[in-house]
Amino acid sequence: MADSSTSELACVYSALILHDDAITAEKMNKIISAANVNVEPYWPGLFALEGKNIGDLICNVGSSGPAAGAPAAGAAGGAVEEKKEEKKAESEDESDDDMGLFD
């Protein structure tokens, strides 16, 4: 594993360990040094989530962003009806089950 990946994982794990307590760069440095992992000094500062609720961050990982512009309700309803009419017309044409292969 690359050094940057190891450093990043060490910071992430230390932040998760500190989940119930305030996550600060100082506390993360203590945990990382106790684990005998060498990390560049800027990593804990980047991952210090002071003022953020990590529980909310964990819960929102799978949630998506806002939906793209949705069509107006009236326009969407008309499109659905047109599709149904097209399907009915196609099914009537195919009612002979293609027995007259090339009519």
Swiss-Prot record:
Keyword Cytoplasm annotated: no
A biological process term (GO) from this entry: translational elongation
Basic and acidic residues bias: start-end ranges: 80-90
Extent of Acidic residues compositional bias: 91-103
Pfam family, one: Ribosomal_60s
GO cellular component: cytosolic large ribosomal subunit
Entry GO MF terms: protein kinase activator activity; ribonucleoprotein complex binding; structural constituent of ribosome
Region (Disordered): 66-103
Keyword line: Ribonucleoprotein, Ribosomal protein
Role of this protein: Plays an important role in the elongation step of protein synthesis.
UniProt cross-references to PANTHER family, sorted A to Z: 60S ACIDIC RIBOSOMAL PROTEIN P1, LARGE RIBOSOMAL SUBUNIT PROTEIN P1
Subunit and interaction comment: P1 and P2 exist as dimers at the large ribosomal subunit.
Family: Belongs to the eukaryotic ribosomal protein P1/P2 family.
Protein name: Large ribosomal subunit protein P1
